[in-house]
Amino acid sequence: MSYQLIYADPAWQYSNKISNGAAGGHYSTMAVEEMKRLPVSSIADENAVLAMWYTGNFASEAVELAHAWGFKVKTMKGFTWVKLYEQARSRIERALAEQTMIDFEDFMDTLNVETVMNGGNYTRGNTEDVLIAVRGSGLERLNASIKQVVYSCRGEHSEKPAEVRFRLEELYGQVSRIELFSRGEASGWHHWGNENPFNDIELVPASFTTIPPMRNSRVKVLAGHYQALTPLSASKHQISAGIVYLQEVAA
């Protein structure tokens, strides 16, 4: 089965604990090169959309990952999640009931206080973004009123707001869709994740293979829709899908 809409929350591996809150201690993470070897291109429709979460630490890696999966990034700001503290809703509702928040300035002050203060080497982070990338001609936008910014309370570590999934459904309608790196179920979606007991498919990173040098020639690696020409000096070639065909071509 191929999917027209792929929604992914990659398990980024952070090296700076100031910037991420030690993600590896809360859930399984993967190196970028390992995620690139997931055969996502083999499950994507020839015309598909990828909506992928990333943080500012991984902006360039997110673009590389989308490209490795066969997608071209169209915007880095498909959605922006402004994170509120877990108890923000109850505190705001209490302020309204007690009439301690009575005008616009009070509201804006409260909203600013209730946005989280994460780590950061410059300013303190409180947002996370979803890029939009396409394969082929992508998908038709069915609803032109879908907004970018999502205000939502923070949940479990790395848990993303369901509102983004709902907006994607409204944006693209009833297409075949899958959520990658998921940890639960959602109606109308297929799922894959290494911590998800409800997987609908299995994705395994492709391994490396060693190809002996070929005199006066190059090696063309055909994997899915990829077509990578490698230099003679390279002895290892990355496989980006389950089946790889090798073809000798003129130098």
Residue ranges and their predicted role:
Residues R215-Q227:
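Amphipathic alpha-helical oligomerization segments
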Residues P231-Q247:
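Basic/aromatic-rich interaction segments and small domains that mediate binding to polyanionic partners
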